């Protein structure tokens, strides 16, 4: 039921929520009141709220006063319809401050006392409502009329007596001297002209409260105390709300100001906002069922309250004082802190009930230990990480990968024999590390024995969960690595399949139906091999996986790899077409093998026909790839697959059910035109070879005998050319240039590694130059000795010449004979030793009874076995036949080469040149 007359306060800084019934006329609690509090957000206030209740006679303006004080909207009486009962039961409203940092206020408007409608049962309800208001409220407003002061019933004298008696059950002044129930006496229709406010206050305090305090029976401890020890009493005079509305508003502001100054910062009953409804309901039920408040003794409540306050204060002081600790310092620091906290707590709590204080003290120490739970986990975090890294290293060592060779090795064995044990090994390592952690954590159990004795074990499960998470993460990294290797094995199978496909594409009998049927069978066979070979490995790597799952998964992955291979093949399709054309056009079968085509043996017509057929056969591949086939894909539960399976994360986007993307018509035309041009180039090259073979005899047709004759006839020229190249002034520069060329090329090609190859060559060259230099020195020495020998021989010849002047005529005859012989020798270019020449001269001399020129050597030293060139000093290979006929000059007629011999001819013999090898 909502209020019909709402009197808002224009200066109010609060917002009131529409009142809701708490208890109806029959004293039944309304469950909707709890929903009302929840919807209003009251549960979020904690202890930051206050409770205000009001007591007073029926039709005394209680609801109007609450509306004026808190800007509430309780229903008020419509005087135009006569006096009657307006508020029935107990209603509650929630007043929220516009400043969110301020407390909320729960306002209860209760049914008025002295109700004619209640009849004889009015006293029961008055007693119940009074106890309820006193048990819940931070402040109780007593609303009385000025004109009723002095009356027994109208002034609520009996109600006040009930309030005072009930409060004795709730307060123990011995333990909490400052605790007082606040009573606001609001005297309505008061005016200074009627009576001063001080007189009214004295009347309320003395004639009402003190009189009641003296009349009731009190425990012994309250005998010497006044009513002021239990209550904080304030008396306010309120002007008439109708005739003196402005004065009434000012008086209400004074009441509100006093309330704001006296209200506690937190709810005095220490009941949180989310449990307020349950607390209120239990209090109301207790009052109805037992007619008195069945609450624990105030001493225990006070001890519990104060010890809890001390405990809270100490815990709050520890919040910002806890440091980050290392594992080795944790236990020592914690035990020292517990001793310090215990001493600090009992220095204040020892004045209260020992049972309660020890109980709360134990709770305090336990809560201190619980506050250390995050620091405990942080201190042991490094140890947990160490265990995780250790487990990862052990697993990595157990499944070490070696891919350096041609075949993948895991733990120096074939992966298919090792992978099936992966998940089992992971579980064993994880269990081992968890047991190791549990054993280590048992050393951190807290055993405290002092004023309070207790044992405490930290919550180990978060650390175990953290270890399992880290270990699982490390294992997942290794698992993903091995699954990637497994996927590479699967891709390798697919690539091997495509090697066969490419061979099939080079077949001349290729056609569309045959190719796709062949590929379909090959794909199924590859998939079967993959499942047979890799299923146990996959099941071992992925815990809980099944064979059916891998069959479906491998099919999708193979199809993805197939599409990738076909895409790569289409990118290189032009090269493949050229290879097909080259195979069909430039090669032919011979005894089951391909051999190059001999175009010079082919006719022009055969060449044209072969070109046409090869082109058509090569372009058949385009027609094959313009179509494709589909493969039925398996269906999966995406929610299950994505969070559990590794391979599906590698599939970027959806997978098509087609083996490949068919070639478009435009692409086919462009590719055909491009290939046709290159086909034509091959055709023209074949034409050139064919024309060259038919018009001119090939040098390959020259008989081998011709090459043999050519070698014999040109032997002297070949030897002369090689001798020129091997001379020092040509050979040495060539060697130097070759060495530097080799060094430069090696540095360019090999970089830093070039020294490995250049150094041996350099060492070999240096040793060769050293040997060459030694030979050169020896040669110079030999030349010097030959020179001295030559001088002696010349001297002997001159002496012989003087004694043989009569032989000049014989020399002419011998010269003619030798000249004739030399012409014959030169003509046939036959090698001849000088000894043969000398023997020939002796024979001719004997035939003609002439003296031989060798007789000149009879008295001199023996001829040396080797002769030196008289021009350059090198070993002689030639001699002049023209000079050989003159015996005295024969010793000077040796020459090393044709060039030196020509120099001799120009100077000595003129144009008559007769050569012979020595």
From Swiss-Prot:
State its Enzyme Commission number(s).
3.6.5.-
* Domain (GB1/RHD3-type G) ranges: 46-280
Give the protein's function: Probable GTP-binding protein that may be involved in cell development.
Q: What keywords are assigned to this protein? A: Coiled coil, Endoplasmic reticulum, GTP-binding, Hydrolase, Membrane, Nucleotide-binding, Transmembrane, Transmembrane helix
Organism of origin is: Theileria annulata
GO MF term list: GTP binding; GTPase activity
Membrane-spanning regions, if any?
702-722, 726-746
Task: State its location(s).
Answer: Endoplasmic reticulum membrane
Q: Which Gene3D superfamilies match?
A: P-loop containing nucleotide triphosphate hydrolases
Q: Name one GO cellular component term.
A: endoplasmic reticulum membrane
* Descriptive protein name: Protein SEY1 homolog
The UniProt entry's sequence similarity note says: Belongs to the TRAFAC class dynamin-like GTPase superfamily. GB1/RHD3 GTPase family. RHD3 subfamily.
Enumerate the residues binding GTP: 56-63
- What does the record list as coiled-coil region(s)? 554-626
Q: Which residues lie on this side of the membrane: Cytoplasmic?
A: 1-701, 747-918
Please tell me which top-level EC class this enzyme sits in: hydrolase
HAMAP family given for it?
Sey1
- Supply the PROSITE patterns for this chain: G_GB1_RHD3 (PS51715)
Give ranges for the Lumenal compartment: 723-725
Name a Pfam family for this protein: RHD3_GTPase
Q: Which InterPro entries match?
A: G_GB1_RHD3_dom, P-loop_NTPase, RHD3/Sey1, Sey1/RHD3-like_3HB, Znf_HIT
Chief place where the protein resides: endoplasmic reticulum
**Is Nucleotide-binding found in the keyword set?**
yes
- What PANTHER family does the database record attribute to this sequence? PROTEIN SEY1
